[in-house]
From Swiss-Prot:
Organism: Photorhabdus laumondii subsp. laumondii (strain DSM 15139 / CIP 105565 / TT01) (Photorhabdus luminescens subsp. laumondii)
Gene3D superfamilies: 3.30.70.1730, 6.10.250.2350
Lineage, highest ranks first: Bacteria, Pseudomonadati, Pseudomonadota, Gammaproteobacteria, Enterobacterales
Any Gene Ontology biological process: translation
Protein name: Large ribosomal subunit protein uL10
Gene transcribed to yield this protein: rplJ
InterPro entries given in the database record: Ribosomal_uL10, Ribosomal_uL10-like_sf, Ribosomal_uL10_bac, Ribosomal_uL10_bac_type, Ribosomal_uL10_CS_bac
Subunit field text: Part of the ribosomal stalk of the 50S ribosomal subunit. The N-terminus interacts with L11 and the large rRNA to form the base of the stalk. The C-terminus forms an elongated spine to which L12 dimers bind in a sequential fashion forming a multimeric L10(L12)X complex.
Length: 168
């Protein structure tokens, strides 16, 4: 279906708006993936807070101009599926990585995080970022361990002082 100028402008405006508020972006090639599988991917994306869209390369290039995802322009070759993570940075990368395992025809091209281009080979860097809740849990466990360690050292120091007083 041919798009008229207003449709193209609307697509560019929509994708540009999403890109400005996104935390990260992942670009993939979905050639050879069935419609049913793509529908499953889109549904999983909605549940994970990931905006997924198939966009013409010329339109996506215009949409990312002036955003942190301008570095992805070289990845916009061939059929392009782009996903923007809106809730946590690793969501789209994690979603695409899991989908690619089950669908060999699905190829991740690249990703971007905070204006840095991440090639497909290094997508694990982004996919393994903890969610907000996981990061808080790790921080709390580290703080809890530090407090427990301090308590143990303090009790050991008190015991040594008591032993020294008894000897003297």
């Amino acid at each position: 279906m041919a798009l008229n100028l207003q449709d193209k402008q609307a697509i560019v405006a929509e994708v540009s708006e999403v890109a400005k508020g996104a935390l990260s972006a992942v670009v993939a090639d979905s050639r050879g993936v069935t419609v049913d599988k793509m529908t499953e991917l889109r549904k999983a994306g909605r549940e994970a807070g990931v905006y997924i869209r198939v966009v013409r390369n010329t339109l996506i290039r215009r949409a990312v101009e002036g955003t942190a995802y301008e570095c992805l322009k070289e990845a916009f070759v061939g059929p392009t599926l782009i996903a923007f993570s809106n809730e946590h940075p690793g969501a789209a990368a994690r979603l695409f990585k899991e989908f690619a395992k089950a669908n060999p025809a699905f190829e991740i091209k690249a990703a971007a995080f905070e204006g840095e281009f991440i090639p497909a080979a290094n997508i694990d860097r982004l996919a393994t970022l903890p969610t907000y809740e996981e990061a808080i849990a790790r921080l709390m466990s580290t703080m809890k361990e530090a407090v427990a360690g301090k308590l143990v050292r303090t009790l050991a120091a008190l015991r040594e002082l008591r032993e020294q007083k008894e000897v003297a």
